[in-house]
Regions:
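N-terminal leader/capping segments at the start of a protein or of a new domain
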Residues: 1-42
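Ligand-binding loop in jelly-roll beta-barrel domains
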Residues: 131-151
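Long hydrophobic alpha-helical segments typical of transmembrane helices together
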Residues: 169-191
Length: 191
């Protein structure tokens, strides 16, 4: 089952992006839309909330047919985290359940990456990434004993974008395409 909030978010995000706003406007206006969505924890279908015992899950919720944006439910099992990685596009992270620690990395003159301070996202809060300002980070579930869920929105189909993980000590990149763990997406029009 889907919930009207998900459909409303997709419609509003689509309307905004069709106007071709500048990235700072996308991040500001998109963050407001996403904050409204994650303010309520009653719309995400249960099948997109299931953790995996070994690694985080990336469930596709929506992918715009023109690649204007995609929307993903990230489900973090206890203690799970990403490697240091980039996105190659803008992104918004809305915390739905639990807590997540977002740690940005800063490229140094020698090519290595220096770890910055982590920011903890609480339910209802929204963070962002952008190649223009802060694209390289590591994300971790704050909790060691329970799952957390965040809703991510990206400027393109993130599951098809060629991105990179980095060795922070050397800066050495390794290319990857994340894909998705689900084979079906929510029916936005079925209430």
């Amino acid at each position: 089952m889907s919930h009207p909030s998900l459909l409303n978010f997709v419609q509003e995000m689509s309307r905004m992006l069709q106007g071709k706003p500048a990235e700072p406007d996308i991040l500001m206006r998109g963050a407001s839309l996403l904050a409204n969505l994650v303010a309520n924890d009653n719309w995400l279908p249960e099948e997109f909330t299931r953790p995996h015992p070994q690694h985080y899950q990336q469930y596709l919720l929506y992918a715009d047919p023109l690649d204007l944006f995609s929307m993903v439910s990230f489900v973090w099992g206890p203690g799970q985290k990403t490697p240091v990685h980039d996105h190659m596009t803008w992104g918004l992270i809305g915390m739905l359940r639990g807590k997540e620690v977002d740690t940005h990395y800063h490229k140094q003159k020698d090519g290595s990456y220096r770890r910055g301070e982590g920011v903890t996202l609480l339910p209802g809060q929204v963070g962002s990434v952008s190649p223009a300002t802060h694209d390289v980070h590591e994300v971790a579930n704050f909790y060691q004993d329970r799952s957390s869920i965040s809703i991510h929105v990206y400027g393109g189909n993130i599951g098809r974008i060629n991105r990179h993980v980095f060795d922070p000590a050397t800066g050495q990149p390794t290319s990857f395409v994340s894909g998705y763990c689900n084979s079906v997406v929510p029916n936005l029009w079925k209430m």
